[in-house]
């Protein structure tokens, strides 16, 4: 079996753009393996040269030309990175020229956009949403719950918390979540805490076998992790969702990104920034 191809994500900011687009492309080659290296905040010539050295060293040690996904605005830094011995996909160079042609004007590179009032507002909206989600995780508090954009419900370990945090971070959505415990599942009514907010509820379900595997890692050989317990809880939760007309999604084969988009569409929610 051949050694994994080395992949570098190089950015003058967080690296999330390079990672997201790069991963979407690499996922089309499921038969190959990759070793990933992320280098964020490459925003000076010195940092760029250091990254180039790492890329070239990887080429020498691995014997294969690395792949580099580059998201860098500054021309000088991009020029330095171009000197790396790698197959490079530079998002700004690839798409900026096409946009300039379509808009019939040249781009004016500026760092100002990174620190504009608009970005400050986006940051504030994101942090407010994250704090809200953390303060309303796992049903710990019903204070200001009426301010939630959506309230996720599901049995323990069905993916509620990561989905809430992703909605908050990526979309500024105030997402709370409530764990369905056995007492809730035995009742024909909705849990008292979330009952007033019926229109904001969205359910998460999961295949019992997958749920058992997750719970087994947390509490090995416990009643909590038994397959019969998982099957019963999942079935009861789905019955509750159907009985009260609560939309729900299966988290088993969905990424958190897919789940978030599905929830936004189903609940008719819009990004806050």
From Swiss-Prot:
Keywords: Kinase, Nucleotide-binding, Serine/threonine-protein kinase, Transferase. InterPro entries: Kinase-pyrophosphorylase (IPR005177), PSRP (IPR026530). GO terms for molecular function: ADP binding; ATP binding; phosphotransferase activity, phosphate group as acceptor; protein serine/threonine kinase activity. Its EC number is 2.7.11.33, 2.7.4.28. The keyword Kinase applies. The keyword Kinase applies. It catalyses: [pyruvate, water dikinase] + ADP = [pyruvate, water dikinase]-phosphate + AMP + H(+); [pyruvate, water dikinase]-phosphate + phosphate + H(+) = [pyruvate, water dikinase] + diphosphate. It is an enzyme of class 2 (transferase). ADP binds at residues 154-161. Pfam families: Kinase-PPPase. Bifunctional serine/threonine kinase and phosphorylase involved in the regulation of the phosphoenolpyruvate synthase (PEPS) by catalyzing its phosphorylation/dephosphorylation. Belongs to the pyruvate, phosphate/water dikinase regulatory protein family. PSRP subfamily. This is Putative phosphoenolpyruvate synthase regulatory protein.
């Amino acid at each position: 079996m051949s050694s994994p191809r080395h992949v570098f994500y190089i950015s003058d900011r967080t690296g999330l753009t390079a990672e997201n687009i790069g991963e979407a492309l690499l996922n089309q080659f499921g038969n190959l393996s990759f070793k990933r290296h992320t280098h964020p905040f490459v925003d000076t010539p010195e940092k760029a040269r250091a990254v180039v050295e790492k890329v070239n060293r990887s080429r020498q040690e691995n014997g294969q030309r690395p792949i580099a996904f580059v998201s860098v605005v500054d021309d000088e830094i991009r020029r330095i990175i171009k000197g790396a011995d790698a197959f490079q996909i530079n998002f700004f160079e690839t798409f900026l020229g096409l946009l300039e042609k379509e808009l019939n004007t040249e781009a004016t590179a500026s760092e100002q956009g990174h620190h504009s009032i608009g970005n400050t507002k986006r940051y504030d909206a994101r942090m407010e949403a994250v704090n809200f989600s953390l303060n309303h995780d796992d049903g710990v508090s019903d204070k200001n719950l009426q301010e939630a954009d959506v309230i996720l419900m599901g049995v323990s370990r069905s993916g509620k918390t990561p989905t809430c945090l992703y909605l908050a971070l990526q979309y500024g959505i105030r997402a709370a979540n409530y764990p369905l415990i056995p007492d809730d599942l035995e009742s024909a009514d909705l849990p008292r805490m979330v009952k007033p907010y019926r229109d904001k509820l969205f359910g998460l379900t999961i295949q019992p076998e997958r749920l058992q595997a997750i719970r087994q890692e947390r509490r090995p050989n416990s009643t909590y992790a038994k397959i019969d317990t998982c099957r019963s809880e999942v079935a009861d939760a789905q019955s509750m969702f159907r009985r009260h007309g609560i939309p729900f999604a299966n988290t088993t084969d969905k990424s958190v990104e897919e789940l978030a988009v599905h929830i936004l569409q189903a609940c008719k929610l819009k990004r806050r920034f």
